[in-house]
Swiss-Prot record:
Keyword RNA-binding included in the entry's annotation: yes
PANTHER family xrefs: 30S/40S RIBOSOMAL PROTEIN S3, SMALL RIBOSOMAL SUBUNIT PROTEIN US3C
Residue stretches of biased makeup (Basic residues): 228-240
A Gene Ontology molecular function term of the record: structural constituent of ribosome
GO BP: translation
Keywords assigned: Ribonucleoprotein, Ribosomal protein, RNA-binding, rRNA-binding
Gene assigned in the entry: rpsC
Function comment: Binds the lower part of the 30S subunit head. Binds mRNA in the 70S ribosome, positioning it for translation.
Name this protein carries in UniProt: Small ribosomal subunit protein uS3
Comp. bias regions, Low complexity: 241-267
Keyword Lipid metabolism among record annotations: no
């Protein structure tokens, strides 16, 4: 099964960003790397369970020394906020109890749910739970995504489709979905439909177009600058110690020759 790879991890640093933004090298209990990973997983599971009707697309977690920032991207922000912010306050209090730190809760609205793969997968799963035929649910999701401006969509259902005795997988695809092109903006989502005859897995890939050459080059340049910035405090290698002063002197000589003479103007 070596050909299977996580769609997010495959594109990290190219078209995808990390959804947990923090660093830990501590050995103190509660602040170790594994502790933060388990805590992030618990936060996401709690939010998915409590906000199941809110259409949560993704949850981004950032950490500082004494604060946890949780960004919730949802298609129905009104459900997350609640009446006069009561629901948001309840969620924040629950997260503070879970983490033991001050929690900053930010809620963002997903403008176009038809182009969000996670929300499309949740929509198909809800229809399957409500006994809508799987072919009809897949066809409707495809049509909505293509009308919203997607260049391609791919949907896979796995399980006892239609209540069949033997489980199977069904693929539907419309348009172009280049999964091997790293410059392609591919959005991926997964959700499980809980039906009376078992669970059905729903996977959705939505192709939104390629990154332009300029965007790709800018992103690569920014990443290389970040890597060089992290290495700036290192000592030069042995072969580079003597070459560095010579290079600096050679670079300063042409600059001095090309610089125009200063002129003084009097009024």
């Amino acid at each position: 099964m070596g050909q299977k790879i996580n769609p997010f991890g495959y594109r990290l640093g190219i078209t995808e960003n990390h959804r947990s933004k923090w660093f830990s090298d501590s050995n103190k209990v509660g602040e170790r790397y594994r502790d933060f990973v388990l805590e992030d997983d618990a936060i996401r599971k709690a939010m998915s369970k409590d906000l199941e009707r809110a259409g949560v697309s993704r949850i981004v977690i950032e950490r500082t020394r004494d604060r946890v920032r949780v960004d919730i991207h949802t298609a129905r922000p009104g459900i997350v906020i609640g009446r006069r912010g009561a629901e948001a306050e309840r969620v924040r209090a629950k997260l503070e109890k879970l983490t033991g730190k001050q929690v900053q809760l930010n809620i963002f609205e997903v403008k176009n749910a038809a182009l969000d793969a996670q929300l499309v997968a949740q929509g198909i799963a809800e229809q399957l739970t409500n006994r809508v035929t799987f072919r009809r649910a897949m066809r409707k999701a495809q049509q909505d995504a293509m009308r919203a401006g997607a260049k391609g969509i791919r949907i896979k259902l796995s399980g006892r489709l239609g209540g069949a005795e033997m489980s199977r997988s069904e693929f539907y695809r419309e348009g172009c979905v280049p999964l091997q092109t790293l410059r392609a903006l591919i959005d991926y989502g997964f959700f499980e439909a809980k039906t009376t005859y078992g669970r059905i897995g729903v996977k959705v890939w939505i192709y939104k177009g390629d990154m332009t050459e300029r965007e790709f080059e800018e992103q690569q340049a920014q990443q290389s600058n970040n890597r060089q910035g992290r290495r700036g405090d290192r000592r030069p290698r042995r072969g580079q110690r003597n070459a560095a002063p010579q290079q600096n002197a050679a670079a300063e000589a042409p600059a001095a020759a090309e610089a125009p003479a200063a002129t003084e103007t009097k009024e």
